[in-house]
């Protein structure tokens, strides 16, 4: 029977509940347990697919095509289990499900209320999500509840967790509460009062934390931990100090050294071997002792909020980890390049244009792509970054001066990137798509296997087949592919049924390393295994750096 650990937060959001949950999962997995994770989001949106990156950060796409919270990316990077649609749900999905049941008459004429109907539905979703991994035989499911204790939106989720604890009985459910212990510079001391109030609020709901994770910018002294334990009504060793570190991959060791996994296993009556975190120790050692250093320019319009590119940033770090390279990322606002001033690109070892939506900043990205192509700087374009590379190539090398995407100009003379107006949905039914279609859930989503053309860079990286995740509406227009290929572009991977371009590259005679991909490879990169595409990209950046230094000598 699966046991549950609920991870809650207090005082403020963005303390790192997702990292804490993922780190605990990694420790338990290293003890030989089968672990899965769930994220419960209290907002009313059905999913984050239509939310602004400035509001929500990155949208993480699962193998089965769900648009989910970015914390699921942390989960996949820290544990071996793959997340699915069932591993993330929102208030919107809960209410949608309950209302459908009410309309079908499943409640037999009863008044539908938050308690018990909404809370029962939340519990059903939690148990369904826990069964989605390990063939339904997970030993532990770690359930992160978004928001903070005291939020109106979070109350039904916390009540559902309390009810699950009561229903399942002793030693079946544990609670880890993450809270803030701020350092007040003017007083020169850490303040525990916000944490005391947060735990008090949680206990009012009927939940007593098993462990308390106290976030601070420095280690919390024992006397402060003793004070917290007294007011929180829990043993001092269950008050865990979680301080700021330079890499999130140190967190599993930090929590393990303070006995968090021991506390949880004792509460749940789980017997398991000691944790073996040697892989994480080796990872941290490699990160702290690189042999090389490069700078990659990431050109986008969400650069002021790097959470928008969380998986991509981590994928680049993973590639650095597997090439013993410190990867520095310089974030470049694409709108600042639209005036033609590209001097900021001169010191870069490689250029990357990530995925995105909308017209704003696209001409600046195209200038960066042109710079990379003409100067021989390694280039990687992801999703929109590939589409813009096709537009740049069409304009300057294929004789289509006004080439564009219909996303930006629906009257363009050469729509080299266009909307696919007819797709098969997940059930195999024809689904019409147009510019007027709903935005939510109407993209090509999830993993797809695609054959790769032999003798290409893509084949050297991936082998005969690529299996990556997608999140996009627009595609490279097949009508223009012959003209692009005649001008020198190589389409190195195509979808088997629609024959749509999935990867493009330039031959070595035109550029040393220029690759665009329609999918999102960052979603499958992990610190343990890295990713072949990002590894090849970092190696190309190192080669470019060495050639530049050799030429300058």
From Swiss-Prot:
Q: Which residues of this UniProt protein bind UTP?
A: 13, 191-196, 227
Pathway entry: Pyrimidine metabolism; CTP biosynthesis via de novo pathway; CTP from UDP: step 2/2
Q: Name one Pfam family in it.
A: CTP_synth_N
Q: Which GO terms describe its cellular component?
A: cytosol
Q: Where does Mg(2+) bind?
A: 71, 144
What's its EC?
6.3.4.2
Q: How is its activity regulated?
A: Allosterically activated by GTP, when glutamine is the substrate; GTP has no effect on the reaction when ammonia is the substrate. The allosteric effector GTP functions by stabilizing the protein conformation that binds the tetrahedral intermediate(s) formed during glutamine hydrolysis. Inhibited by the product CTP, via allosteric rather than competitive inhibition.
Which segments constitute the Glutamine amidotransferase type-1 domain?
Answer: 295-547
Q: Which residues of the sequence carry a binding annotation for L-glutamine?
A: 356, 384-387, 407, 473
Per the UniProt entry, what is one GO biological process?
A: 'de novo' CTP biosynthetic process
Q: Which residues form the active site?
A: 383, 520, 522
Named from the GO MF annotations, one term is: glutaminase activity
Entry binding sites for CTP: 13, 151-153, 191-196, 227
Catalytic activity as recorded in UniProt: UTP + L-glutamine + ATP + H2O = CTP + L-glutamate + ADP + phosphate + 2 H(+); L-glutamine + H2O = L-glutamate + NH4(+); UTP + NH4(+) + ATP = CTP + ADP + phosphate + 2 H(+)
| UniProt entry keywords in alphabetical sequence | ATP-binding, Glutamine amidotransferase, Ligase, Magnesium, Metal-binding, Nucleotide-binding, Pyrimidine biosynthesis
Task: For the region Amidoligase domain, give the residue spans.
Answer: 1-270
Q: What class of enzyme is it?
A: ligase
Cite the InterPro entries for this sequence. Answer: Class_I_gatase-like, CTP_synthase, CTP_synthase_N, GATASE, GATase1_CTP_Synthase, P-loop_NTPase
In this chain, ATP is annotated as bound at: 14-19, 71
Q: How does it assemble?
A: Homotetramer.
Q: Which HAMAP family match?
A: PyrG (MF_01227)
Q: Other remarks?
A: CTPSs have evolved a hybrid strategy for distinguishing between UTP and CTP. The overlapping regions of the product feedback inhibitory and substrate sites recognize a common feature in both compounds, the triphosphate moiety. To differentiate isosteric substrate and product pyrimidine rings, an additional pocket far from the expected kinase/ligase catalytic site, specifically recognizes the cytosine and ribose portions of the product inhibitor.
Name the job this protein performs. Answer: Catalyzes the ATP-dependent amination of UTP to CTP with either L-glutamine or ammonia as the source of nitrogen. Regulates intracellular CTP levels through interactions with the four ribonucleotide triphosphates.
Family of the protein in this entry: Belongs to the CTP synthase family.
Q: What is this protein called?
A: CTP synthase
Lineage, top ranks: Bacteria, Pseudomonadati, Pseudomonadota, Betaproteobacteria, Burkholderiales
């Amino acid at each position: 029977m699966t046991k549950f650990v609920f991870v809650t937060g207090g005082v403020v959001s963005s303390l790192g509940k997702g990292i804490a949950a993922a780190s605990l999962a990694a420790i338990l997995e290293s003890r030989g347990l089968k672990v899965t994770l769930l994220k419960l989001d209290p907002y009313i949106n059905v999913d984050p697919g239509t939310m602004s990156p400035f509001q929500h950060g990155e949208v993480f796409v699962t193998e089965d095509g769900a648009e989910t919270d970015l914390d699921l990316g942390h989960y996949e990077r820290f544990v071996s289990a793959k997340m699915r649609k069932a591993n993330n749900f929102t208030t919107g999905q809960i209410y949608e499900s309950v209302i459908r049941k009410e309309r079908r008459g499943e409640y037999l004429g009863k008044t539908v209320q938050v308690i018990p109907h909404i809370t029962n539905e939340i519990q059903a979703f939690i148990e369904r999500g826990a069964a989605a991994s390990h063939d339904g035989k997970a030993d532990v499911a770690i359930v992160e509840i978004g928001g903070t204790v005291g939020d109106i939106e979070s109350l039904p989720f916390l009540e559902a967790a309390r009810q699950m604890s009561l229903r399942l009985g002793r030693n079946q459910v544990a609670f880890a509460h993450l809270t803030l212990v701020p350092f007040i510079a003017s007083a020169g001391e850490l303040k525990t009062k916000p944490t005391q109030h947060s735990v008090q609020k949680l206990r009012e709901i009927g939940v007593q934390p098993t462990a308390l994770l106290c976030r601070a910018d420095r280690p919390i002294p024992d006397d402060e931990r003793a004070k917290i334990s007294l007011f929180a009504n829990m043993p001092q060793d269950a008050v865990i100090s979680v301080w700021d570190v330079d890499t999130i991959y140190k967190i599993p060791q930090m929590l393990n050294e303070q006995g968090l996994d021991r506390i949880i296993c004792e509460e749940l009556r789980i017997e398991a071997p000691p944790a073996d975190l040697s892989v994480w120790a080796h990872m941290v050692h490699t990160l702290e002792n690189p042999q090389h250093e490069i700078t990659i320019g990431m050109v986008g319009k969400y650069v002021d909020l790097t959470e928008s590119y969380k998986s991509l940033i981590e994928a680049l770090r993973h590639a650095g980890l597997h090439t013993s390279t410190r990867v520095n990322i310089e974030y470049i606002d694409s709108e600042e390049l639209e005036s033609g001033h590209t001097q900021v690109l001169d010191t870069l070892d490689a250029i990357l244009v990530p995925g995105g939506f909308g017209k704003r900043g696209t001409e600046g990205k195209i200038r960066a792509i042109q710079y990379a192509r003409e100067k021989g700087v390694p280039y990687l374009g992801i999703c929109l970054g590939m589409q813009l590379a096709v537009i740049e190539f069409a304009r300057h090398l294929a004789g289509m001066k006004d080439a564009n995407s219909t996303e930006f100009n629906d009257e363009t003379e050469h729509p080299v990137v266009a909307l696919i107006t007819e797709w098969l949905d997940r059930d195999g039914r024809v689904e019409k798509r147009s510019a007027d279609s709903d935005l939510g859930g109407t993209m090509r989503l999830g993993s797809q296997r695609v054959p790769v053309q032999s003798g290409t860079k893509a084949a050297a990286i991936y082998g005969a087949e690529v299996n990556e995740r997608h999140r996009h509406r627009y595609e490279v227009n097949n009508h223009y592919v012959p003209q692009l290929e005649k001008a020198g572009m190589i389409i190195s991977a195509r979808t088997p049924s629609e024959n749509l371009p999935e990867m493009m590259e330039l031959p070595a005679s035109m550029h040393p390393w220029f690759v665009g991909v329609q999918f999102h490879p960052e979603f499958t990169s992990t610190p343990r295994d890295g990713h072949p595409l990002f590894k090849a990209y970092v190696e190309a950046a190192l080669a470019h750096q060495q050639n530049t230094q050799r030429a300058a000598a």
